[in-house]
């Protein structure tokens, strides 16, 4: 594996697609990139992806979900941007922390090398030392794959993104022309008179070209498909062929985007430009499972309450997506009802009472915990199907300890370090940990599943491997008390409790791990499928009756 620029040989055979964005952030670069990758994978190519995040954080682990959405956890324990979750779901691959490049990670590595004397007294600068490190990371992530898609976070013109765009300019200079493709995603808004305006796209491309990058493909994010006049203007003023201008209009479900851009011919154009068309599978032999999965008709509809503290979908994105996947598997429309755990007022309580099932997700801190416990009590006492994830698992233990075991004031030591009954306590290996970033119990761990339990029925195996992100666990001193009162810990990692359930309840299931991070279209997470299937078995959910 090459470790420095001078070791690199362009003949290694990788193809690189760089995806940049203009006009504004949050346009959907990641979904555009992931959809392109999905279509190339359908054509028989081994595709991977890299997300560049130009912030100074080393990783996303300490970021506020209000600002950046959920922290997505990889198999190797990397805490990363939620876009990597979309890549894993669309491409059906397991990525690594090396597939996320941040400014903090890059600068730290360069500074460590300088301190170690690796630069032999040279003046360490953005060019060439930082840009060389960026290029090295991209090439190492791409090794062994046919195609690597690299998304550059942020918007062209952002000052923090400049070193990355310069690295890309150098990258293109070092590679063969038919091994590199630049895709630029921009906003094409409507004017008040209904005309699609291309000026923002023109200015965005002008900014990109001033850095030395010329896009090969332009993708217009718009409410509706680009009309011919808009395409002609974009092609003329941005200096790209008409055939290289594609639409990416709004859709109700992101899983339809690959089908839409396939109709536009984006995948075929990409393969032709990269010289991949002759190696691609014939259209009649390409995988159609994706289309079959995401376009199937639904026969049922369910409402599931999500009881959390972050009132935005991106903060719990993988849970929303996992419910979609469970819906694909059961031919069910799954509606999510947001319930604010911090304000369990009459409106939210009514929403909870109308729900067919309840999910209490992961999280940190004291805010909203009593509301979550209240929701768990409601689910347990009223036989409402319930799924608790990470903190939701822990709060289910707290609720049971208080209301069934009679342990007044029982709580998690994270929330109340003076409780008389710390049924949830800090992991022993965390006692001496002081740093916050990257120090939790992270990544994939195996769980042994007890035969004859709901967990065994769901996973259909004696063991499962799921991803974790936590510092606290069930206190071993209270396990006997909890079990003697009827709570079953059906999954364990040695002496650590990983799964809980109540045998006499239709579906009361909690996991210390995050099963949502391994769910995929066509391969939905077992706990989510179990939740939806139980609702269908115990509730009248016919779509026509619900609509009526």
Curated annotation (Swiss-Prot):
Its EC number is 6.3.4.2. CTPSs have evolved a hybrid strategy for distinguishing between UTP and CTP. The overlapping regions of the product feedback inhibitory and substrate sites recognize a common feature in both compounds, the triphosphate moiety. To differentiate isosteric substrate and product pyrimidine rings, an additional pocket far from the expected kinase/ligase catalytic site, specifically recognizes the cytosine and ribose portions of the product inhibitor. The lineage of its organism: Archaea, Methanobacteriati, Methanobacteriota, Stenosarchaea group, Halobacteria. This is CTP synthase. The gene is pyrG. Homotetramer. Gene3D superfamilies: 3.40.50.880, P-loop containing nucleotide triphosphate hydrolases. Residues 303-541 form the Glutamine amidotransferase type-1 domain. Mg(2+) binds at residues 83, 151.
């Amino acid at each position: 594996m090459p470790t420095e620029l001078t070791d690199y040989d362009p003949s290694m055979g990788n193809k690189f697609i760089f995806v940049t964005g203009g006009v504004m952030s949050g346009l959907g670069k990641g979904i555009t990139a992931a959809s392109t990758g999905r279509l190339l994978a359908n054509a028989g190519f081994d595709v991977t992806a890299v997300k560049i995040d130009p912030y100074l954080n080393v990783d996303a682990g300490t970021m506020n979900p209000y600002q950046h959405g959920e922290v997505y956890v990889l198999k190797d324990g990397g805490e990363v941007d939620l876009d990597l979750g979309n890549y894993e779901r669309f491409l059906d691959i397991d990525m690594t922390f090396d597939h996320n490049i941040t400014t903090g990670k890059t600068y730290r590595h360069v500074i460590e090398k300088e301190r170690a004397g690796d630069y032999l007294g040279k003046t360490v600068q953005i060019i060439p030392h930082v840009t060389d490190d960026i290029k090295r990371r991209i090439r190492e992530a791409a090794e062994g794959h046919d195609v690597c898609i690299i998304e550059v976070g942020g918007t062209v013109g952002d000052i923090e993104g400049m070193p990355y765009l310069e690295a890309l300019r150098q990258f293109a200079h070092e590679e063969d022309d038919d091994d590199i493709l630049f895709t630029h995603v921009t906003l094409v808004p409507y004017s008040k008179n209904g005309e699609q305006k291309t000026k923002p796209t023109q200015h965005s491309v002008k900014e990109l070209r001033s850095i030395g990058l010329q896009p090969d493909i332009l993708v217009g994010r718009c409410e509706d498909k680009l009309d011919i006049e808009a395409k002609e203007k974009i092609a003329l003023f941005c200096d790209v062929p008409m055939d290289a201008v594609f639409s990416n209009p709004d859709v109700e479900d992101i899983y339809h985007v690959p089908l839409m851009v396939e109709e536009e011919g984006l995948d075929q154009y990409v393969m032709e430009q990269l010289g991949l068309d002759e190696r691609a599978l014939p259209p009649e032999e390409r995988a159609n499972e994706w289309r079959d999965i995401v376009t199937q008709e639904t026969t049922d509809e369910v409402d599931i309450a999500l009881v959390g503290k972050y009132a935005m979908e991106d903060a719990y994105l993988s849970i929303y997506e996992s419910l979609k996947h469970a819906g694909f598997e059961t031919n069910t429309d799954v509606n999510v009802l947001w319930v604010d755990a911090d304000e369990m007022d009459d409106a939210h309580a009514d929403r909870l009472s109308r729900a067919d099932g309840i999910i209490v997700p992961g999280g940190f801190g004291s805010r909203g915990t009593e509301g979550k416990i209240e929701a768990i009590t409601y689910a347990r006492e009223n036989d409402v199907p319930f799924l608790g994830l990470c903190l939701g698992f822990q709060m289910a233990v707290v609720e049971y300890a208080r209301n069934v075991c009679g342990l007044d004031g029982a709580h998690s030591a994270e929330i109340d370090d003076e409780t008389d009954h710390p049924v949830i306590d800090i992991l022993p290996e965390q006692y001496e940990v002081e740093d916050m970033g990257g120090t939790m119990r992270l990544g994939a761990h195996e769980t042994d599943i007890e035969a004859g339990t709901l967990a065994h029925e769901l996973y259909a195996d004696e063991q499962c491997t799921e991803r974790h992100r936590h510092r606290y666990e069930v206190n071993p001193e209270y396990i006997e008390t909890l079990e003697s009162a009827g709570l079953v810990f059906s999954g364990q990692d040695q002496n650590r409790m990983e799964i809980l359930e109540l045998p006499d309840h239709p579906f009361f299931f909690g996991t210390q791990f995050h099963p949502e991070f391994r769910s995929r279209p066509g391969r939905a997470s077992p706990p989510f499928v179990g939740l939806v299937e139980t609702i269908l078995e115990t509730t009248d959910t016919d779509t026509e009756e619900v609509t009526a």
